[in-house]
Design a protein with these regions (language model features):
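Unchanged
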Residues: 1-267, 354-355, 390-403, 407-409, ...
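Left-handed beta-helix
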Residues: 185-196, 210-418
C-alpha cells in the first residue's frame, strides 16, 4: 500500500508520498516491504499509489527489474478513473477493491497486504505457513506492545490457538483496553519478557485467502482496520501471527527521526548488514565517501559524500551530502542531495549569494532533519531546544513533534539562528 497523504510526516511528504521518503542514508521506505517480499520468495508485487507519486514511481522503475523469462514484477497501480470509479481511493480496503481485477489475471491462492511506511524484517513464508496450517481465512501479523501505546494501533484478543476473538481499532476506553490485554498464558509463550500488561497490536500486515478477500470487499467498506476486519470477526476464521522482532511504524516526524538515529547506534536493533536478507535499493554507482580531518561518533554516512573538518555525533548522513569546515552536527538526519554542483554552478551561485547545497562552514545543527537539496549557509545555528514542539519559522523551517525540519530544497542564509 502506497499510503495516503502522509500529513503527520509533513513537510517530508510535501513533494513525495510516505513510501518515497529517504531512509538510512541511501534507501527509501518502500524498499523495506519489497525487499521482505523478495527475500521471502514473493516476486509478484502490486504497489498501490495515489498522492505525490512521481518520485516513488521513478525509484521503483529504476530499481526493481526482473529478467524477461521469469514471472516476477513490481507493478505500480496508480489511482485511476474508470467507468465504475471516478474518484480517489477512499481508504486501504477501497484501494485493494479497485485493483482486484488486476490480481485475478495471475494465479494465486493467497494475497499478502502490506503497508509502505514501516521498518521491520519478516519472513512472510512463516506467516503464510501458519495461515495454511490453522485453516485461517485471514491472518494478521501482530506485535506485543505495552497497553500505554495501544491507543494509536489496532488491538486484538486471541485464544490459546491464536484465533482472534476480539478486535478494536485505536481503543481509547480503559476498560476496553484492559479486556484486550494478553493473558498470562500467552505472555508465558513469548520470548520477549515484560514487566507490565501488553496487548497484541495489529501491524497492518494481512494474509487473505483469495475467496475471502473477494467476499470481504464485496461492499463499500473503505478501511481494513476500522471496518473490514471487525466485520469478519465471528463470521470467518481470523488468526494472529505473533511477531516479536523489531518493528516500527514510521507515521510521524518524531518516529521517522528516532528510527533513523537508532540505526547509528553501535548495535542497532534493525540490521542493514545481514547478507542473507539484504535490503535492496537503486544502484546509483556513486564514489566512496571522502572524510577529511573529522571527528565522528556513531554515524551512518551514505555514498558519494564529502565531509570535511567537522564533527558528526549520532547522525545519519545521506548520499552526495556536503558538510563543510568547522561545522558540528549532533542528532541530525541529513538526507543528502540528488545531484552534485559543478564548478561553474558553484561560482555562479556564490556570485548571487546563494549557499551551496549541503551544510556550510561553521554551522551548529542539533536535533534536526535536513531534507534533500537543502542549502545551509555559513554560520547557521539550528536547534529545536527551548522551542514549542510544533511551530513555523523563517525560510520554511518547521518544528514538528519536537524535531526541527529543513524542507527539501530550502535555502537558509548565512548567519541564520533558529
Amino acid at each position: 500500500m502506497g499510503g495516503g497523504r502522509g500529513t503527520r510526516l509533513y513537510p517530508l511528504t510535501k513533494e513525495r508520498c510516505k513510501p518515497a521518503v529517504p531512509l538510512a542514508g541511501k534507501y527509501r521506505l518502500v524498499d523495506i516491504p519489497i525487499s521482505n517480499c523478495l527475500n521471502s520468495g514473493i516476486n509478484r508485487i502490486f504497489l498501490l499509489t495515489q498522492f505525490n507519486t512521481a518520485s516513488l514511481h521513478r525509484h521503483v522503475q529504476n530499481t526493481y527489474h526482473f529478467d524477461s523469462f521469469g514471472q516476477g514484477f513490481v507493478d505500480i497501480m496508480a489511482a485511476e478513473q474508470t467507468e465504475k470509479y471516478a474518484d480517489w481511493y477512499q481508504g486501504t480496503a477501497d484501494a485493494v477493491r479497485r485493483n482486484v481485477v488486476h490480481f485475478r489475471t495471475h494465479p494465486h491462492d493467497y494475497v499478502l497486504i502490506l503497508s509502505g511506511d514501516q521498518l521491520y524484517r519478516m519472513d512472510f513464508r512463516k506467516v503464510i505457513a501458519q495461515h495454511i496450517a490453522t485453516g485461517a481465512d485471514v491472518t494478521i501479523a501482530a506485535q506485543p506492545v505495552p497497553v500505554s501505546k495501544i491507543e494509536d494501533l489496532g488491538a486484538m484478543r486471541v485464544d490459546d490457538n491464536l484465533e482472534i476473538k476480539q478486535f478494536a481499532e485505536k481503543p481509547k476506553d480503559a476498560a476496553l483496553i484492559d479486556s484486550l490485554a494478553m493473558s498470562p498464558a500467552l505472555e508465558a509463550r513469548l520470548t520477549t519478557g515484560s514487566t507490565g500488561k501488553r496487548c497484541l497490536a495489529s501491524m497492518g500486515i494481512y494474509v487473505f485467502s483469495r475467496g475471502v478477500l473477494q467476499q470481504a470487499l464485496d461492499n463499500s467498506m473503505r478501511d481494513f482496520g476500522k471496518e473490514v476486519i471487525p466485520s469478519l470477526l465471528g463470521r470467518k476464521r481470523l488468526f494472529a501471527y505473533i511477531f516479536e522482532g523489531y518493528w516500527v511504524d514510521i507515521g510521524t516526524v518524531r518516529a521517522f527521526f528516532e528510527a533513523n538515529l537508532a540505526l547509528a547506534e553501535p548495535v542497532p536493533r534493525f540490521n542493514f548488514y545481514m547478507h542473507t536478507t539484504p535490503i535492496y535499493t537503486h544502484a546509483r554507482f556513486l564514489p566512496a565517501t571522502k572524510i577529511n580531518r573529522c571527528t565522528i561518533d556513531n554515524a551512518v554516512i551514505g555514498d558519494g559524500s564529502i565531509i570535511t573538518d567537522c564533527t558528526l555525533k549520532h547522525c545519519v548522513i545521506g548520499i552526495r551530502a556536503m558538510v563543510r569546515d568547522g561545522s558540528h552536527l549532533e542528532d541530525v538526519v541529513m538526507m543528502g542531495a540528488d545531484f552534485y554542483e559543478s564548478e561553474e554552478e558553484l561560482k555562479e551561485h556564490a556570485a548571487r549569494g546563494l549557499p551551496s547545497v549541503g551544510v556550510g562552514r561553521g554551522c551548529n545543527i542539533r536535533g534536526s532533519i535536513i531534507d534533500k537539496n537543502a542549502r545551509i549557509g555559513d554560520g547557521v545555528v539550528l536547534s529545536p531546544e527551548g522551542k514549542p514542539p510544533n511551530g513555523e519559522y523563517p525560510y520554511d523551517v518547521l518544528i514538528r513533534d519536537g524535531v526541527l525540519v529543513v524542507p527539501k530544497g530550502a535555502v537558509i542564509p548565512p548567519g541564520t539562528k533558529i
